[in-house]
Amino acid sequence: MSHPVVPDQAGPDGERVIGIIDLGSNSLRLMLVRILPDGSHTVLNQVKNMVRLGEGAFETGHLREESMARTINVLRGMAEMCGVYGASEVIAIATAAVRDAANGPDFMRRVKEKTGIDFRVVSGREEARLIYLGVSSGLAHTESLRLFIDIGGGSTELVVGNSEEYRNLDSLKMGCVRLSNLFFDKDSGTISAKRYAALQRSEEHTSELQSLIRI
């Protein structure tokens, strides 16, 4: 999904500007890019804000009101930036914090109403595929298989592939914010015996890696 912030600003030579927004469990990023007629691009500006949208959400299953308000406030500014740069389109992606929260759909409706930005909430596997496309596009051609790992706030994506195609991919619910919220005391940073035992049980998920990397 995409949202036209302003009328198409493509120049006579076919150049156009687009905004790309990535809403994660911890950070919110905006990249403004000029797309040239030959398909190449130039990065015009990049912005990153630590909105901590997923803070506490993985414990309760709901996004907190203060986290949502903080995120919407930053998104308003990003929408304004897209207008200033004459972006003809905004591509906005939301990941683990939104897709796992019971109130995620309601939050996305609020975002559209308050900012005009229409987000696409992607699955874990689609997130892994998009990460692979981004990373592999910068690799030299090779048929050798590689393991791509992206550790985010709410999930970890893994892909096995070469520079041309992926062979297997998966997404695990093992992000740094998720694990910190679930197992560590938010004030002292310590971990109780009960939570340590639960953390050890979570290691069972790593057995999924064996099937992923076995080609």
List each language-model region with its residue ranges.
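Conserved phosphate-binding catalytic cores of ATP/NTP-utilizing and phosphoryl-transfer enzymes
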Residues: 2-16, 123-147, 207
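Gly/Thr-rich phosphate-binding beta-strand-loop-beta motif of the actin/hexokinase/Hsp70
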Residues: 11-41, 135, 141-172
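Short glycine-rich, Thr/Ser-proximal phosphate-binding strand/loop in the N-terminal lobe
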Residues: 28-66, 162-195
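N-terminal, Lys/Arg-enriched amphipathic/low-complexity engagement segments
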Residues: 68-72, 76, 80
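Short beta-strand-loop/turn "lid" adjacent to the catalytic site in phosphate-handling enzymes
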Residues: 79-110, 211
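Short, ordered loop/turn segments at secondary-structure junctions
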Residues: 95, 124-126, 163
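A glycine-rich helix N-cap at a beta->alpha junction
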Residues: 116-122
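Single conserved hydrophobic/aromatic residue that forms the stacking wall/gate
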Residues: 204-215
